[in-house]
């Protein structure tokens, strides 16, 4: 059982550290940017800059947002900071949010990593506004890491020069949203843009310390350079979502205050049952010991139940809302019927408020994510193949029982004291419907299949894509797309065929397996039964005893 890392959810965005936690170097850089922006606005005689408390309000604005905001913003576009201030102020009014701003922009061609710095400077300066009618650049610069990572993708390499050559000639627009910050808000916004046929080329997402969002997208796909038509289309799309019942009504709720905190939480959570199972635990037999992990919505403790060592995931009473209860119910509903050596064993749950918890077997060696990224350990090929096989067997079992995990990643893979790896965390898993396809996004952008990112119908093959990213992690010990934000990674996966770069010394058949599993077309990805066979064949070739 794992506690999710909220900073890597599908609504992932930067979170502000407290002043005592802030990196001193970042603080100094933020102060420098603030000072330069202030000077430019005052020298340009902006009306806002003449107000008595403007300096304090501007500093407050920078402090509301993460250091990355100051590091990324172009000081030459100091007036854009005023726009962000205005949008955040308007977003405080429930009657007006979500608020947004649209403008046409000029995007410079990307320069390759090995370009001459003088050439790069000349190229960039030649695309800066130089006269009437010339468009300004976007507020934030393109990530220099994005181009470097895409060089590892064959899909991108073949078309990169074409893309770069045409970026500066197509109409581009910058759309900035501000509203209440909510889980999965980014998914809702990207879906909204997709409904209008807009392609996201750059994305920057920030959260304020007081619970608001500032999301900036550079898009193409709108045929006109003017902004009035696009602004009207966005307004109509938002109104359309507000007016529609059912699932889309739920989508637009992400723009509003969370009313669930004011709703009554039932005394007992109803879990569907066929009458043949009994999983409600006797809390008096539960002994709670050391806390081993903590998240925004729950804590994970080590403990014992009827003398058996267990892991106990508690929901935090002060954070419980109806969406959390739905996921809690779903996790219990799925786990109570799951029995496989490569799936974490569910032992029971307490569904009576205020003690809401799920009890599973305790996995002594923790998550694969911690093993790779916190303990800085690595797998040799033989062990890697065994781990990959364990995961494939667990996932094959789930798929045979029509369960799509939807959040497969190394943080949700746990290892016991014998080195056996098991699939865990079914909070967002779903039982596949009869049609074989599902919609609505969940999961984590860095591991998410392109069809899920695009809000297209998807099936169990989405898990196969995530499995490929997991396999790449096992090979490299790195975090996927580490130098991109989760949202930038998502844009790259969908629009540029971005994939992590496979190490040169990778076993050829492991490389082939990776490429099949993360194929853009879900139909071309293998089933887990096939993956098991391929892994077993590779293990024979390298003399691994299964």
Swiss-Prot record:
<feature type="domain" description="ACT">
    <location>
        <begin position="174"/>
        <end position="249"/>
    </location>
</feature>
<dbReference type="InterPro" id="IPR000719">
    <property type="entry name" value="Prot_kinase_dom"/>
</dbReference>
<protein>
    <recommendedName>
        <fullName>Serine/threonine-protein kinase STY8</fullName>
        <ecNumber>2.7.11.1</ecNumber>
    </recommendedName>
</protein>
<feature type="modified residue" description="Phosphoserine">
    <location>
        <position position="435"/>
    </location>
</feature>
<feature type="region of interest" description="Disordered">
    <location>
        <begin position="1"/>
        <end position="21"/>
    </location>
</feature>
<dbReference type="InterPro" id="IPR008271">
    <property type="entry name" value="Ser/Thr_kinase_AS"/>
</dbReference>
<keyword id="KW-0547">Nucleotide-binding</keyword>
<feature type="modified residue" description="Phosphothreonine">
    <location>
        <position position="439"/>
    </location>
</feature>
<dbReference type="InterPro" id="IPR045865">
    <property type="entry name" value="ACT-like_dom_sf"/>
</dbReference>
<dbReference type="GO" id="GO:0004674">
    <property type="term" value="F:protein serine/threonine kinase activity"/>
</dbReference>
<comment type="similarity">
    <text>Belongs to the protein kinase superfamily. Ser/Thr protein kinase family.</text>
</comment>
<keyword id="KW-0067">ATP-binding</keyword>
<dbReference type="InterPro" id="IPR002912">
    <property type="entry name" value="ACT_dom"/>
</dbReference>
<feature type="region of interest" description="Disordered">
    <location>
        <begin position="111"/>
        <end position="141"/>
    </location>
</feature>
<dbReference type="Pfam" id="PF07714">
    <property type="entry name" value="PK_Tyr_Ser-Thr"/>
</dbReference>
<dbReference type="InterPro" id="IPR051681">
    <property type="entry name" value="Ser/Thr_Kinases-Pseudokinases"/>
</dbReference>
<feature type="binding site">
    <location>
        <position position="313"/>
    </location>
    <ligand>
        <name>ATP</name>
    </ligand>
</feature>
<feature type="active site" description="Proton acceptor">
    <location>
        <position position="407"/>
    </location>
</feature>
<feature type="binding site">
    <location>
        <begin position="292"/>
        <end position="300"/>
    </location>
    <ligand>
        <name>ATP</name>
    </ligand>
</feature>
<dbReference type="GO" id="GO:0009658">
    <property type="term" value="P:chloroplast organization"/>
</dbReference>
<comment type="function">
    <text>Serine/threonine protein kinase that specifically phosphorylates chloroplast precursor proteins in the cytosol within the cleavable presequences (transit peptides). May be part of a cytosolic regulatory network involved in chloroplast protein import. Does not phosphorylate mitochondrion precursor proteins. Specific for ATP and does not utilize other NTPs. Plays a role in chloroplast biogenesis and differentiation in cotyledons, possibly through phosphorylation of chloroplast preproteins.</text>
</comment>
<keyword id="KW-0963">Cytoplasm</keyword>
<keyword id="KW-0808">Transferase</keyword>
<keyword id="KW-0723">Serine/threonine-protein kinase</keyword>
<keyword id="KW-0597">Phosphoprotein</keyword>
<dbReference type="InterPro" id="IPR001245">
    <property type="entry name" value="Ser-Thr/Tyr_kinase_cat_dom"/>
</dbReference>
<dbReference type="GO" id="GO:0005524">
    <property type="term" value="F:ATP binding"/>
</dbReference>
<keyword id="KW-0418">Kinase</keyword>
<dbReference type="GO" id="GO:0004712">
    <property type="term" value="F:protein serine/threonine/tyrosine kinase activity"/>
</dbReference>
<dbReference type="GO" id="GO:0106310">
    <property type="term" value="F:protein serine kinase activity"/>
</dbReference>
<dbReference type="InterPro" id="IPR011009">
    <property type="entry name" value="Kinase-like_dom_sf"/>
</dbReference>
<feature type="domain" description="Protein kinase">
    <location>
        <begin position="286"/>
        <end position="539"/>
    </location>
</feature>
<dbReference type="GO" id="GO:0005829">
    <property type="term" value="C:cytosol"/>
</dbReference>
């Amino acid at each position: 059982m794992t506690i999710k890392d909220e900073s890597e959810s599908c609504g992932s965005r930067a979170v502000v550290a407290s002043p005592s936690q802030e990196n001193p170097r970042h603080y100094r850089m933020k102060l420098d940017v603030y000072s330069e922006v202030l000077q430019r606005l005052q020298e340009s005689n902006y009306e806002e800059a003449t107000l008595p408390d403007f300096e304090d309000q501007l500093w407050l604005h920078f402090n509301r947002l993460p250091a990355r905001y100051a590091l990324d913003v172009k000081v030459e576009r100091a007036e854009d900071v005023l726009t962000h201030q205005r949008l955040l102020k308007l977003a405080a009014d429930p009657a007006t949010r979500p608020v947004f701003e649209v403008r046409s922009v000029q995007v410079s061609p990307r320069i390759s990593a090995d370009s001459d710095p003088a050439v790069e400077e000349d190229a960039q300066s030649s695309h800066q506004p130089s006269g009437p009618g010339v468009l300004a650049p976007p507020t934030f610069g393109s990530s220099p890491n994005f181009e470097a990572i895409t060089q590892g993708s064959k899909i991108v390499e073949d078309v990169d020069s074409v893309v770069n050559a045409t970026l500066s000639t197509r109409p581009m627009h910058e759309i900035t949203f501000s509203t209440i910050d909510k889980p999965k808000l980014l998914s809702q916004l990207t879906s909204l843009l997709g409904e209008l046929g807009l392609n996201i080329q750059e994305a920057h997402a920030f959260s304020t310390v007081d619970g608001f969002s500032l999301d900036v997208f550079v898009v193409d796909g709108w045929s006109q350079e003017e902004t009035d038509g696009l602004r009207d289309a966005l307004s109509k799309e938002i109104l359309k979502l507000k007016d529609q019942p059912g699932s889309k009504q739920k989508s637009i709720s992400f723009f509003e205050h969370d009313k669930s905190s004011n709703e009554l939480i039932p005394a007992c959570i109803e879990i569907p049952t066929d009458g043949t199972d009994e999983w409600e635990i006797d809390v008096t037999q539960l002994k709670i010991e050391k806390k081993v992990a903590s998240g925004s919505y729950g804590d994970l403790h080590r403990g014992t139940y009827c003398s058996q060592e267990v892991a106990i995931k508690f929901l935090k009473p002060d954070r419980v809302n109806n969406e959390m209860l739905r996921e809690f119910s779903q996790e219990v509903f799925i786990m109570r019927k799951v029995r496989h050596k490569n799936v974490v064993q569910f032992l029971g749950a307490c569904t009576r408020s205020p003690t809401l918890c799920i009890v599973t077997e305790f996995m002594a060696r923790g998550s694969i994510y911690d093993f790779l990224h916190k303990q800085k350990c690595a797998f040799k090929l033989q062990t890697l193949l065994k781990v990959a096989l364990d995961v494939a067997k667990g996932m094959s079992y789930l798929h045979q029982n029509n369960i799509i995990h939807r959040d497969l990643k190394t943080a949700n893979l746990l290892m016991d004291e014998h080195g056996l790896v098991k699939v865990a965390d079914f909070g967002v898993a779903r039982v596949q419907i009869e049609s074989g396809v599902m919609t609505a996004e969940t999961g984590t952008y860095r591991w998410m299949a392109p069809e899920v990112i695009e809000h297209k119908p998807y099936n169990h093959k989405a898990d196969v894509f995530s499995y490929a990213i997991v396999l790449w992690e096992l090979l490299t010990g790195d975090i996927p797309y580490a130098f991109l934000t989760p949202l930038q990674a998502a844009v790259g996966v969908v629009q540029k065929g971005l994939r992590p770069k496979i190490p040169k010394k990778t076993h050829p058949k492991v490389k082939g397996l990776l490429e099949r599993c993360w194929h853009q077309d879900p139909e071309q990805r293998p089933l887990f039964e096939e993956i098991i066979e391929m892994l077993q064949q590779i293990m024979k070739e390298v003399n691994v005893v299964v």
